[in-house]
From Swiss-Prot:
UniProt organism field: Thermobifida fusca (strain YX)
First-tier enzyme category under EC: lyase
Taxonomic lineage of the native organism: Bacteria, Bacillati, Actinomycetota, Actinomycetes, Streptosporangiales
Family: Belongs to the OMP decarboxylase family. Type 1 subfamily.
Cross-referenced PROSITE patterns: OMPDECASE
E.C. code: 4.1.1.23
GO process terms (BP): 'de novo' pyrimidine nucleobase biosynthetic process; 'de novo' UMP biosynthetic process
Pfam families referenced in this protein's UniProt entry, alphabetically: OMPdecase (PF00215)
Annotated gene: pyrF
Role noted for this protein: Catalyzes the decarboxylation of orotidine 5'-monophosphate (OMP) to uridine 5'-monophosphate (UMP).
Name this protein carries in UniProt: Orotidine 5'-phosphate decarboxylase
Residues where substrate binds: 10, 32, 60-69, 115, 176, 185, 205-206
Active site, UniProt feature: 62 (proton donor)
Length: 233
């Protein structure tokens, strides 16, 4: 079984993204297309990275606008059949609900607090207190509005799982194999720790895509997770 990893295809062009996708797809469950690549190439990039593969598509657009606009955006990409589409939980319950209703076949994944933000950064934008408090509030709000998936730091995964129960898919960015550079992520954990905390899907980008051989890097990580019992066999 493919490892529960969404490889972030944050490539400079569609050709590179397609090459990475072909290399890693045999080893991981999901391919993630982000905002930059989608804005540059539109739906064509989805078809390019998906090809004839069975790998799930994660469209990470982090929609955040008034409910009607988000509903229209969600409806416009629903035809691409993404398994997941992200919206910001901070957009409010009505906005999350609008996305859910506009794309019923897609799991709307509500982003709680970006993993690039530490408590000082949160305080600067008016979100006082520990990050986990904001994550908890936003997670509950989003699930009550119909979101079937949540995006949170691995450091908050156990707390979120306890709050929302077993049926919501928990997606964790900020995942770094032991020894990998932290980069622009502030709240991180290893893949094994994230899965142990209750994560269902790990978002991993640069440790795989910036490796000399992305396919080999994905295969090695998948094998390590299976060996440690963190990933289903």
């Amino acid at each position: 079984m493919a490892a529960p990893i969404a490889v972030a295809l944050d490539a400079p062009d569609v050709e590179t993204a397609s090459r990475w996708a072909a290399a890693v797809a045999p080893h991981v469950s999901t391919l993630k297309v982000g905002l930059e690549l989608y804005l540059r190439y539109g739906p064509a990039v989805v078809e390019a990275v998906r090809g004839a593969r069975e790998t799930a598509l994660f469209l990470d657009l982090k929609l955040h606008d008034i409910p009607a606009t988000v509903a229209g955006a969600a409806r416009s990409v629903a035809g691409l059949a993404p398994a997941f589409l992200t919206v910001h939980a901070a957009g409010g319950a009505d906005m999350v609900r609008a996305a859910v209703e506009a794309a019923p076949e897609t799991r709307i994944a509500a982003v709680t607090v970006l993993t690039s933000l530490d408590e000082a950064a949160l305080g600067a934008v008016g979100m006082r207190g520990p990050a986990r408090d904001a994550v908890r509030r936003l997670a509950v709000l989003a699930v009550e509005a119909g979101a079937r998936a949540l995006v949170c730091s691995p450091q908050e995964a156990a707390m979120v799982r306890a709050e929302v129960g077993p049926d919501v898919t928990l997606i964790t960015p900020g995942v770094r194999p032991a020894g990998a550079a932290q980069g622009d992520q502030a709240r991180v954990a290893t893949p094994e720790a994230a899965l142990a905390a209750g994560a269902d899907l790990l978002v991993i980008g640069r440790p795989i895509t910036r490796a000399p051989d992305p396919g080999a890097a994905a295969a090695a990580l998948a094998a390590e997770l299976q060996k440690t019992g963190a990933s289903p066999s």
